[in-house]
Amino acid sequence: MKIKQSEKKVLKAAGHNLKPVITIGMNGLSESLMSEFEKTIDHHELIKIRIRISDKSSRKELIEELCDKSKSQVVSTVGSTAVVFRKNPKSQKKFF
């Protein structure tokens, strides 16, 4: 499911005030981190992630890998922070 530009705008605004709930360190994506990410994104749908890697291209690759593995989508990235969205069909939340 591709996010439309109008939907992305709404999600970006909603994600602005969020605090990062997951921090990815130098070790990258471990099984335990992926498990925690799955639980968190199922519950919240829209989450902010902080990535503690200084290299910009490595951060981008890590975010893409995370989204591919979890079937989620990047809403926005600013520096070392990314906002990620995945719709939970069981959730009652309405973003748009």
Region spans (language model):
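Positively charged, polar, low-complexity stretches
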Residues: 1-96
